[in-house]
Amino acid sequence: MASATFSVAKPSLQGFSEFSGLRNSSALPFAKRSSSDEFVSFVSFQTSAMRSNGGYRKGVTEAKIKVAINGFGRIGRNFLRCWHGRKDSPLDVVVINDTGGVKQASHLLKYDSTLGIFDADVKPSGDSALSVDGKIIKIVSDRNPSNLPWGELGIDLVIEGTGVFVDRDGAGKHLQAGAKKVLITAPGKGDIPTYVVGVNAELYSHEDTIISNASCTTNCLAPFVKVLDQKFGIIKGTMTTTHSYTGDQRLLDASHRDLRRARAAALNIVPTSTGAAKAVALVLPNLKGKLNGIALRVPTPNVSVVDLVVQVSKKTFAEEVNAAFRDAAEKELKGILDVCDEPLVSVDFRCSDVSSTIDSSLTMVMGDDMVKVIAWYDNEWGYSQRVVDLADIVANNWK
């Protein structure tokens, strides 16, 4: 039997471009402040594209759409920070539904253990509103979406960030309350259309009243899986996401429907399920049944990393795989995919705007058809940037 060959990517080979650094939010006082105008401009161009006879044309938004945030937790607050950092946004956030009240909403938006202090003037405005750099955002509090004043406030789009109302019946309560559309910041259940920016968001139709932005892990996985499948043809594969713990876990051992997640999050590596790999088929239908995976929740508060191993139909080697990623990152996936040549660790990817960053030195090919790819992602900030992008697409295709 012939021995299998093994190749590991060497970033310095063949004149590959050097990693130019992560894009950091200006909201971070401790981060290196570099201009993200190129990123924002590119995304603005992408999200302003409208379908027209199978092609695209620049969209024009005559008026901002009114946006409500339902659930002001990790994603809700990250979304607001991301939106606040965008210039000329077609979105107007006018109300937040949060059971904690104005004082808590204001404090937790301003001071964040992961993001640091928000570089904005944030304060309560009376007993029922929040002020962010003078922008007044109303605060309401009701656990039943059907009771929310969306009709009275003229809400066009609800950012559903509770993680609870993820099916048509649940998310549909926002429509019953008078909202026109709902964007779920989690995997949707049932037949809810799922979109991943950079992968299939161009298929969005204004006729969709409830849509899903998929999960943070699917947003990381799908862009580079799309590249792998287009360039080399994926036969099958498995994925493991080493994922920071989330609010769904227990700080100390306590009851939970998942016995593993019942254990102390900061003390354990917690194996659990994830539908992220299978969900890729929702945005790349030709991969249905070809991918599966698990999650390992680890004692870090933010930033996660995907480890994908796939068998491909076209023979290849590590440098060729990385070259395909670099090409996509400079072209169709610019602002969505990045490639890193530096020997970094998880904290270095905090507040990275992109959906996934390929760790080029860890790309491997076993034999010539088994490919291993490692990709980093900020499971809160990067994901929230895509929620803003998808909301922009909704706004720029408004009729």
From Swiss-Prot:
Role noted for this protein: Involved in the photosynthetic reductive pentose phosphate pathway (Calvin-Benson cycle). Catalyzes the reduction of 1,3-diphosphoglycerate by NADPH.
Nucleus among keywords: no
List of catalytic residues: C216 (nucleophile)
GO biological process, one term: reductive pentose-phosphate cycle
Protein name: Glyceraldehyde-3-phosphate dehydrogenase GAPA2, chloroplastic
SUPFAM superfamilies per record: Glyceraldehyde-3-phosphate dehydrogenase-like, C-terminal domain, NAD(P)-binding Rossmann-fold domains
Catalytic activity, as annotated: D-glyceraldehyde 3-phosphate + phosphate + NADP(+) = (2R)-3-phospho-glyceroyl phosphate + NADPH + H(+)
Positions that bind NADP(+): R74, I75, D98, R143, N379
Keywords associated with the record: Calvin cycle, Chloroplast, NADP, Oxidoreductase, Plastid, Transit peptide
EC number: 1.2.1.13
Gene Ontology MF terms in the entry: glyceraldehyde-3-phosphate dehydrogenase (NADP+) (phosphorylating) activity; mRNA binding; NAD binding; NADP binding; salicylic acid binding
Pfam entry (one): Gp_dh_C
SMART domains: Gp_dh_N
One GO location term (cellular component): chloroplast stroma
Name of the top EC class for this enzyme: oxidoreductase
Pathway(s): Carbohydrate biosynthesis; Calvin cycle
Binding locations of D-glyceraldehyde 3-phosphate: S215, C216, T217, T246, T274, G275, R297
Compartments in which it is found: Plastid, Chloroplast stroma
Species assigned in the record: Arabidopsis thaliana (Mouse-ear cress)
UniProt keyword ATP-binding, yes or no: no
Highest taxon of source: Eukaryota
Quaternary structure note: Tetramer of either four A chains (GAPDH 2) or two A and two B chains (GAPDH 1).
Organelle transit peptide: 1-48
Site (Activates thiol group during catalysis): H243
Chief site of localization: plastid
Family per similarity comment: Belongs to the glyceraldehyde-3-phosphate dehydrogenase family.
Note: Plants contain three types of GAPDH: NAD-dependent cytosolic forms which participate in glycolysis, NAD-dependent chloroplastic forms which participate in plastidic glycolysis and NADP-dependent chloroplastic forms which participate in the photosynthetic reductive pentose phosphate pathway (Calvin-Benson cycle). All the forms are encoded by distinct genes.
